[in-house]
Amino acid sequence: MFGSKYLLILLAGLVICSQAIGIRRIPVEVYVSEAGRKKFLDKGRSIEDIVGSVAEELELKMNEHVYADRASTDKRKFHFDWNVSGMTSSEIDLDKCGKDTNRFQYDLVQAARDKAGVSVILLYTCESEGYSEDFILAGQKTPLVIQRKYPECSNDVATFTETEPMKIESIIANALFITAGSPLNDMVEFEEVDNGRDGFKRDIRLKTTDFSLFSGGVCH
């Protein structure tokens, strides 16, 4: 019979193995109104296309760092299980915005009640410029209103339907990074990198890759 020492070694090996082949799934519901959806379509892209392409690119970058981190035994991939839909709650109107960001905080609380256990991103049809002072005071470059929830392991974000490509991609990337559990804001940046003969290409850069800190280290 195996002794307790060998049993512990076996269990530890099973844990490491499960971490190596498992997936950290982050369920995310993105809400947008018909007017907000039309803003993107008028610019030639659907909101589904934007969220999908950014989520895929962000996953790849995060998982590159997961495998490169020699200090971590948790090699599970991150994966965003995202969905885009219209707002069903009668208490939330994504086409109406208040004088300050307090309205968005209230709506996030309501949305979280309707979608327990899932991170929520609310896309308001208004422009972020009207709230620039609020974000400056909060020390944020990206216009995100954030509600972090412990220990529920889901973080909710309210933001805006910006149609300038780099701006909305930065917004969605940072919002998704927060839904994955990032304790810090503005941790995702887009930059141009030299791609040799092909010229410059746009790439995602992560300013933090210590995923053990995500959601207090207890989620995913």
UniProtKB/Swiss-Prot annotation:
One of its GO terms (cellular component) is spore wall. Coiled coil: none annotated. It is found in: Spore wall. Glycans are attached at residue 83. Residues 1-20 form the signal peptide. The keyword rRNA-binding does not apply. Its main location: other. Keywords: Glycoprotein, Signal, Sporulation. It holds the Pfam family MICSWaP. GO terms for biological process: sporulation resulting in formation of a cellular spore. This is Spore wall protein ECU02_0150. The lineage of its organism: Eukaryota, Fungi, Fungi incertae sedis, Microsporidia, Unikaryonidae.
